[in-house]
Amino acid sequence: MKKKTVDDVSFAGKRVLMRVDFNVPLKDGAVTDDIRIRGALPSIQKVLSDGGCVILMSHLGRPKGKPVAEMSLKPAADRLAELLGKPVQMAPDCIGDEVKNMAAAMKAGDVLMLENLRFHKEEEANDPEFAKSLASLGEVFVNDAFGTAHRAHASTEGVTNYVAESVAGYLIGKELTYLGEATANPVRPFVAILGGAKISGKIDVLENLLGKVDTVLVGGAMVFTFFKAQGYNIGKSLVEDDKLELAKSILEKAKTSGVKFLLPTDVVLADKFDQDANTKIATIDSIEDDWMGLDIGPETANCFREEVVNAKTVIWNGPMGVFEMEKFAKGTMAVAQALADATKQGAITVIGGGDSAAAIAVAGLEDSVTHVSTGGGASLEFLEGKELPGIAALSNA
């Protein structure tokens, strides 16, 4: 179901309540990474250039339902003011009479930042009265926070019940376009790269994508659960013993659905989980007892690269190894580079948030792929084929 976006509405003379994702890292009261604030600028500027005023709301951190001074959104408001080149008023709270009066006094072009939503436990509980109080501040609701779209909270889902119109901002629109198009109408060959430590976190994604993709490339520690299920010795590698049957059934399903399901042929082994560990490369049938696999090997990296550069649509979710340690980052960096090269050749390449987004940033290639999703959990649930409450609640186009 297509949703209305900010382009379907004129905000002239309107007070617009906008949910943004300003959950940014802070150090000494200043924002250390403003990528999420920059991401919200196009939607904010659309409202202002139409002649409306905008009331922004967000959460930051996990204050557990009470005010925590270090989790104030004031530093985010200050950074936004610098980026917009205009003042941003900071509200003392997100509900209450003082906030209501501040909102009522706004004029076209004004920007007001509400204080951290999660200073109130009612936000995550999706409390109707709390949602109604938030909704009363504006006339139109814009959701531009994809990172929380999989949560039915007061500011993402609840408010939509009390405003006349709820639309998607540019960021959410972009997510729906790329994640949606990639999974619903992919240009083939369609390759999914799945990594990370555990099968349990990716079961639903695997199940959903097996019917849609041409090839699945699997890396990260979850490969060892597949290997053990096939009878290989995996040494001290991470394994989910309670998921061995599941691993077998996924391998079986891949076979019957005609999907090319590629596991590594070699791995980088370490004698301990440490940057200064001794390392060696081994084929998967020669892993010794006291060693653990912490990355895909060079042969696998080349094989995966080949699949990626020949693809027309690629989705990547989860690293190939412990990329935070340089010794075990080569596999992940090789995949990141392959995605950049595939993009140059015209492929649609989508990075599904979370650790893969961090990895592509470490590789310095975030601008060399089609789209880096801003939501870790949200993009995962989207790839699992689930409807996201924050999106479902928006007005249909």
Swiss-Prot record:
The keyword Cell inner membrane does not apply. Signal peptide: none annotated. Its EC number is 2.7.2.3. Keywords: ATP-binding, Cytoplasm, Glycolysis, Kinase, Nucleotide-binding, Transferase. It is an enzyme of class 2 (transferase). ATP binds at residues 202, 293, 324, 353-356. It is found in: Cytoplasm. InterPro entries: Phosphoglycerate_kinase, Phosphoglycerate_kinase_CS, Phosphoglycerate_kinase_N, Phosphoglycerate_kinase_sf. GO terms for molecular function: ADP binding; ATP binding; phosphoglycerate kinase activity. One of its GO terms (biological process) is glycolytic process. It catalyses: (2R)-3-phosphoglycerate + ATP = (2R)-3-phospho-glyceroyl phosphate + ADP. Substrate binds at residues 21-23, 36, 59-62, 118, 151. It holds the Pfam family PGK. GO terms for cellular component: cytosol. CDD domains: Phosphoglycerate_kinase (cd00318). Pathway: Carbohydrate degradation; glycolysis; pyruvate from D-glyceraldehyde 3-phosphate: step 2/5. PANTHER family: PHOSPHOGLYCERATE KINASE, PHOSPHOGLYCERATE KINASE 1, CHLOROPLASTIC-RELATED. Belongs to the phosphoglycerate kinase family. Monomer. This is Phosphoglycerate kinase. It comes from Chloroherpeton thalassium (strain ATCC 35110 / GB-78). The lineage of its organism: Bacteria, Pseudomonadati, Chlorobiota, Chlorobiia, Chlorobiales. The gene is pgk.
